[in-house]
Amino acid sequence: MEEFLYLIYGLIVLAGGAGVVFLVWTQYRKFLQESKNYERGLKMVYLHIHLPPSSTDLESTGSSRDQRDLTDEILSQAQVMYSIIASTVYSGFKARLFGQRHLSFEIVAKDGLIYYYAVVPMSLIDIIKQAISTAYPSARIEEVEGKNIFQESANYNSICGGEFTLRKEPAYPILTYQESKQDVSRSLLNALSASKQGDGVAIQILIRPADESWVDVAINTTKAMREGKKGGSKGLNIGYKPGELLEVLWKPPQSNEQKDDFKGPDEVDRMAIEAIENKIRYPGFETLVRVVVSSETSTRSQSILQNIIASFALLNSTNFNGFKYNQSKNIDELVTAYIMRFFPQSIKTNILNSVELATLF
């Protein structure tokens, strides 16, 4: 009996020791990741992207092409750019610990003028330049200093902003231009065009190649829908709740006739399956969208912010996915995250593919 008690005590001590080691490692890993985020933020370079006016493209290609044709072509070019960026993925221990290297595509409005930037790690400058030039041969890329959107005379309380995250699981797609024929990038441009002297606005679209496991999860989701399992069309957390599991264990087995009653997914699930399968055909990126607005008054800042939020609402799909806006309650943290381009390693459930990103930027 004593030997058994010693064994139990030993197992308890061993489990406690393992728990302490795990806790220490978790905190140490968090410290390493936060330090790496600052290091990455300090080693990023601004690339100013000069794009020719769309009217010039229309005139040069003749009157037979309308704006929609040109938009389709631009979106196709953007998909090429993101496909090249997807090749920057790397593997190994550092990738698992620190996550993939990220970059930021940004639309900045300052004193009524609008600028496009790619803010990238030093190690990725050449490949990002190549990606942009391949997609947009007429674009001119210039390394510059960062644009400060904050006015010295601006009131601290007039700074506002936050982040956009997906409303549902990442397997479900947002509304793209091909489906809605609504040019969201132009809507965002119009929202920023309303800025004037004294206003500063920035939209950051931070991306990094997503782990391939998101595709496996999406495939399991569609499989569950086809088999009519619980949770199939309601999310990626496939399985049973504790109460449902007990019910399954105690419930007598069904006859073959009862099992054959399931006639396959309904129309809603079939649409969801098709949408998910279409999304995973393209490279996926973990994505974080951050917006910061600075103006002379809080009312003015909120007005600009609401116009931007309204533009993102154009990406919301009734049946599938969309964006929800999360207002930042700590302005100091928001401004620091904006300046340093923080992209926490823990953010893994906001995944957009190259088609969805092309609709956005």
Residue ranges and their predicted role:
Residues 2-361:
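Extended, folded cores of ATP/NTP-driven motor/assembly subunits in large transport
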